[in-house]
């Protein structure tokens, strides 16, 4: 039986990162997302600079202001977060359909079928993080292991912008020394019960019998007993049916030079064709999307009589669509190429290994 390989990707201080990307003046500043300092709301996300002052998620905004009076308080922009999240999930699904999103900024990926001797799971995780950085200009932390629990644990061990692998060689040492509050799923209430019963780290938890843990925590006790041993049989659950394939890029600076933009369209057409080939699919619609320097999003789609899957065919259609969309006087900051209305190809295509 092939050993499972699971990746857990967790974006670093996601909302704050998006705000700093879209407003470079905030970079390196203590950014607190959630609302005005005087509001009655709570903190959604705080940058690492703000966390140094003790600010954290779910804290009342008024308290955050007391701790960090010179912080940059930003109202949540969920439209931007959802749009960026969709980009990230699209990247995940370009590698595997076995993706289980847990929120806008984290997901599990089962990449068992992609792993081979010269392409370990850690390298695939590196490729994914690189794609996220190139396409969204955001960093992500990744955890790699043989089950979901350990992958999630690993993703939080070297934040921000980290990659951690937990395998059979190091799992025991990691779990035995882990503070009980750092076990995924152990909140404040559970932590207090643990402390009241002499459980302060993974070793203390490991030494409790299953019966003792069930007595303390009910049905959850069995799960805690297994976690102390690094056991988790839960599957990556994905019910999504792929409807489209695409990729997009944000330029380092706003661009209105056709030659530079069309070079990027060619590159994106190639990436999209590669992903179609991996899936052994062809497409009957092509869409080009641009975002102007004023953050206005424009798109144009063409439906086709015959399906396409090659780089050249996709580019030729994308070229026409871009020419319909462009305004020589309006620079753009992002361009994307997406194909949809997918159908099964009638010939054998490349696999992921042909283009990783």
Curated annotation (Swiss-Prot):
GO cellular component: cytosol
GO BP annotation list: DNA-templated DNA replication; error-prone translesion synthesis; SOS response
Gene Ontology MF, one: DNA-directed DNA polymerase activity
EC category name: transferase
Name of a matching Pfam family: IMS_C
Listed EC numbers: 2.7.7.7
Site for Substrate discrimination, residues: 15
Residues binding Mg(2+): 10, 105
Subcellular location: Cytoplasm
Residue ranges occupied by any UmuC domain in the UniProt entry: 6-187
Subunit structure: Monomer.
Protein name: DNA polymerase IV
Gene name of this polypeptide: dinB
């Amino acid at each position: 039986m092939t050993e499972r390989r699971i990746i857990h990707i967790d974006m670093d201080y996601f909302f704050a990162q998006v705000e700093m990307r879209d407003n470079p003046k905030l970079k390196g500043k203590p950014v607190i997302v959630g609302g005005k300092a005087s509001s009655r709301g709570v903190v959604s996300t705080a940058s690492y600079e703000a966390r140094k002052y003790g600010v954290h998620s779910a804290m009342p905004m008024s308290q955050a202001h007391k701790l960090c009076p010179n912080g940059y308080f930003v109202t949540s922009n969920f439209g931007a977060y959802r749009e960026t999240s969709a980009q990230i999930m699209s990247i995940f699904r370009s590698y595997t359909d076995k993706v289980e999103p847990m929120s806008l900024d984290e997901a599990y990926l089962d990449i068992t079928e992609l792993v081979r001797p010269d392409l370990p799971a850690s390298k695939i995780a590196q490729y994914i993080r690189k794609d996220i950085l190139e396409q969204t200009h955001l960093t992500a932390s990744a955890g790699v292991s043989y089950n979901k629990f350990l992958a999630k644990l690993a993703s939080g061990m070297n934040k921000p912008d980290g990659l951690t692998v937990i395998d059979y060689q190091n799992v025991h040492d990691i779990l035995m020394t882990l503070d009980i509050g750092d076990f995924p799923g152990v909140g404040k209430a559970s932590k207090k019960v643990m402390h009241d019963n002499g459980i302060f780290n993974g070793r203390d938890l490991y030494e409790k019998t299953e019966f003792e843990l069930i007595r303390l925590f009910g049905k959850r006790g069995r799960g805690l007993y297994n976690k102390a041993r690094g056991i988790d049989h839960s599957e990556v659950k994905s019910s999504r049916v792929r409807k489209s394939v695409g990729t997009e890029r944000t330029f380092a600076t706003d661009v209105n030079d056709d030659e530079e933009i069309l070079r990027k369209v060619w590159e994106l057409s190639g990436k999209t064709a590669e992903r179609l080939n991996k899936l052994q699919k062809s497409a009957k619609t092509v869409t080009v999307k641009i975002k102007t320097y004023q953050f206005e999003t424009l798109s144009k789609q063409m439906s086709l009589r015959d399906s396409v899957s090659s780089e050249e065919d996709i580019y030729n259609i994308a070229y026409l669509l871009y020419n319909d969309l462009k305004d020589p006087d309006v620079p753009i900051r992002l361009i994307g190429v997406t194909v949809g209305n997918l159908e099964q190809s009638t010939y054998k295509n490349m696999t992921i290994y042909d283009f990783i």
